[in-house]
């Protein structure tokens, strides 16, 4: 376990995780009881908290055989295209490490 990964706490119906990043201290809850599976990926509802102050609810941990990422809340625009409420630049690779920490919490 790397020094940035904290111990996870398993509760009745959710799993908590923490990750200390360069920009923020991340924490969150995963809800494996509400997990769904499609042909290509596993979707686990989650909430993500930044620095213990801002909580983003309605996120999803998306897992395929070779990739894990966090899907943020979205809305459908006038042209029926899905748009995210959050802009995450591709250069911000820390969010990938947060997704990996969340995935590891599910496995523990």
Where are these regions (language model features)?
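Single-stranded nucleic acid-binding surfaces, predominantly the OB-fold ssDNA-binding core
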Residues: 2-108
């Amino acid at each position: 376990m790397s020094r940035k990964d904290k111990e996870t706490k398993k509760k009745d119906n959710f799993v908590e995780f923490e990750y200390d990043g360069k920009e923020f201290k991340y924490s969150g809850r995963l809800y494996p009881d509400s997990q769904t599976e499609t042909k290509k990926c596993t979707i686990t509802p989650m909430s993500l908290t930044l620095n213990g102050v801002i909580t983003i609810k309605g996120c999803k941990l998306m897992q395929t055989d070779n990739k894990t990422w966090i899907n943020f809340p979205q809305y459908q625009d006038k042209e029926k295209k899905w748009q995210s409420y959050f802009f995450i630049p591709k250069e911000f690779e820390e969010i990938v490490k947060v997704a990996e920490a969340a995935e590891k919490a599910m496995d523990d």
